[in-house]
Amino acid sequence: MEALVYTFLLVSTLGIIFFAIFFREPPKIQTKKTK
């Protein structure tokens, strides 16, 4: 059970970092399009 919690925490942290990097570049193009 503990292993599952640790794995979930690791995956969630990795997902947040991945999303942060992935959504860090597109906004530049989106802000340019909206303006």
Curated annotation (Swiss-Prot):
Gene Ontology biological-process annotations: photosynthesis
Localization, UniProt: Plastid, Chloroplast thylakoid membrane
Membrane topology reported for the UniProt record: Single-pass membrane protein
Keywords: Chloroplast, Membrane, Photosynthesis, Photosystem II, Plastid, Thylakoid, Transmembrane, Transmembrane helix
TM ranges: 3-23
A GO CC annotation given for this chain: chloroplast thylakoid membrane
Origin: domain of life: Eukaryota
Function statement: Found at the monomer-monomer interface of the photosystem II (PS II) dimer, plays a role in assembly and dimerization of PSII. PSII is a light-driven water plastoquinone oxidoreductase, using light energy to abstract electrons from H(2)O, generating a proton gradient subsequently used for ATP formation.
Similarity comment text for this entry: Belongs to the PsbT family.
Description of how the protein assembles with itself and partners: PSII is composed of 1 copy each of membrane proteins PsbA, PsbB, PsbC, PsbD, PsbE, PsbF, PsbH, PsbI, PsbJ, PsbK, PsbL, PsbM, PsbT, PsbY, PsbZ, Psb30/Ycf12, at least 3 peripheral proteins of the oxygen-evolving complex and a large number of cofactors. It forms dimeric complexes.
Entry protein name: Photosystem II reaction center protein T
Organism encoding this protein: Oenothera argillicola
